[in-house]
């Protein structure tokens, strides 16, 4: 797909983007009415398995799912085959690299409790409801997120954090933390050996 044509589609759904947005492949970028989706300058979105040889399993998906939700992607951010899905809000700081197949999800997609889940199944809005637990995510500047990481609701990564491949991240982490594992934990600071 021609990226200039796709940029017109993005503008139609009120996606705001800066200069030099590079789209490789065919991402799915959608902004729900009443939400905010902003992409900074010099952002690269890879959405084709040939665009990143780490092995992309799906195309990039960037979606605001509820009125009032926001996704704010800073300048000079790169991503490959990433899913960014917001019901509340997700901020990604400038100069951040997001590895292949990473998921950044500010919600649980469904309640844990069976009774609440059953209410959601009967929801007249097709499950698009405030019954779904959600908390904003904030990723600082100059972060690196390794491939196949999952960033869960309520996570806050300080500037300069490094997230290891396959980590499942939840919680608040100080700047320059090296974060690995499932559940993810800080094993050291970036300047330490």
Segment roles from a protein language model:
Residues 1-112, 123, 132-142, 149-151, ...:
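Domain-scale signature associated with acetyltransferase and cell-envelope carbohydrate enzymes
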Residues 167:
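Glycine-rich GHKL/ HATPase_c ATP-binding element in histidine kinases
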Residues 117-128:
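Short glycine/proline- and charge-enriched loop/turn segments
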């Amino acid at each position: 797909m021609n990226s200039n044509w796709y940029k017109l589609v993005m503008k139609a759904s009120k996606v705001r983007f800066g200069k030099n947005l590079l789209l490789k492949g065919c991402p799915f970028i959608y902004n729900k009415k009443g939400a905010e989706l902003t992409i900074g300058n010099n952002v690269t979105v890879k959405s084709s398995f040939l665009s990143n040889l780490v092995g992309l399993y799906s195309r990039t998906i960037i979606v605001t799912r509820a009125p009032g939700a926001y996704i704010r992607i800073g300048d000079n951010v790169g991503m490959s085959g990433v899913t960014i899905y917001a019901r509340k809000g997700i901020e990604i700081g400038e100069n951040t690299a997001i590895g292949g197949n990473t998921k950044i999800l500010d919600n649980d997609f469904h309640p844990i409790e069976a009774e609440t889940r059953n209410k959601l199944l009967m929801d007249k809005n097709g499950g698009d409801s405030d019954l779904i637990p959600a908390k904003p995510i904030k990723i600082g500047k100059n972060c690196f997120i390794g491939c196949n990481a999952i960033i869960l609701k309520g996570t806050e990564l300080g500037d300069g954090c490094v997230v290891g491949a396959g980590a499942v991240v939840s919680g608040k982490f100080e700047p320059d933390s090296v974060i690995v594992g499932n559940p993810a934990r800080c094993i050291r600071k970036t300047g330490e050996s």
